C-alpha cells in the first residue's frame, strides 16, 4: 500500500471512529444520549452503608441540565479539590472559570447521585442544594467523556466527586461501575 492509500485508509478509519463515538454520545445531532436508559433499573439506585441515592444522567444541552446543576457540580468540585489545586506546584491554583469551562464542555457527560427520597442522605438534610435537579441533596457525580487515545476509543473519567457524607460508603465504586458499563455499551475500552 502506498503512502497516499495509507493516508486515505487512516482518514477513513478516523472518520468511522468519530461516527461511532458520536453515536454513543448523541441520539441525534445536539441531543445527548441518556446513557443510563439502556442500563438495568438497578443501576439507577444505590443503597449501602446507610446511604440511599437515586442516580440520573445529565449532559450540557440535554434534559436534566441547567445552570443550577452546573453550579452544584462546580461547588462540590471546588469543596473537594480547591486545596489540592492550590497546593500543587505548577497547577496555577484553583480557577473557577477554567473548571466551569471543563464542566460545561459539550462532550461532557455525568452520572449524578442525589439523596433518595428528597432527604439529605446523611448530609445537611437539605433539599437539592442549588435546586439543580429532582430529588435530594447532591451526593456526588462522575464526569466523563468519550475520547480517542491513539488508536483506541475510550471513556475518560474527568471527575469523580463525592460529598463528605457520601464518602467511604461504596457510592464512588458504584459510579465507576456505571462508567464501565456505559463504556462497554458504547463499544469503548
Residue ranges of each PLM-predicted region?
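Short hydrophobic/aromatic beta-strand element in the GNAT-like acyltransferase core
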Residues: 108-112, 141, 154
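Conserved acetyl-CoA-binding loop-helix of GNAT-fold acetyltransferases
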Residues: 168-181
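Active-site rim helix/loop that mediates acceptor-substrate recognition in acyltransferases
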Residues: 83-117, 128-131
Amino acid at each position: 500500500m502506498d503512502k497516499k492509500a495509507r493516508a486515505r485508509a487512516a482518514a477513513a478509519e478516523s472518520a468511522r471512529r468519530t461516527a461511532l463515538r458520536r453515536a454513543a454520545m448523541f441520539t441525534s445531532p445536539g441531543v445527548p444520549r441518556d446513557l443510563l436508559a439502556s442500563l438495568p433499573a438497578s443501576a439507577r439506585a444505590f443503597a449501602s452503608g446507610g446511604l440511599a441515592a437515586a442516580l440520573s444522567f445529565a449532559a450540557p444541552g440535554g434534559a436534566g441540565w441547567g445552570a443550577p446543576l452546573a453550579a452544584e457540580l462546580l461547588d462540590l468540585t471546588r469543596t473537594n479539590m480547591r486545596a489540592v489545586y492550590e497546593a500543587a506546584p505548577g497547577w496555577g491554583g484553583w480557577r473557577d472559570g477554567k473548571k466551569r469551562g471543563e464542566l460545561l464542555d459539550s462532550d461532557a457527560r455525568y452520572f449524578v447521585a442525589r439523596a433518595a427520597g428528597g432527604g439529605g442522605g446523611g448530609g445537611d438534610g437539605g433539599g437539592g442544594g442549588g435546586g439543580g435537579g429532582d430529588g435530594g441533596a447532591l451526593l456526588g457525580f462522575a464526569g466523563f467523556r468519550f475520547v480517542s487515545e491513539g488508536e483506541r476509543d475510550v471513556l475518560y473519567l474527568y471527575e469523580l466527586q463525592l460529598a463528605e457524607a457520601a464518602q467511604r460508603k461504596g457510592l464512588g465504586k458504584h459510579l465507576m461501575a456505571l462508567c464501565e458499563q456505559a463504556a462497554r455499551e458504547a463499544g469503548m475500552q
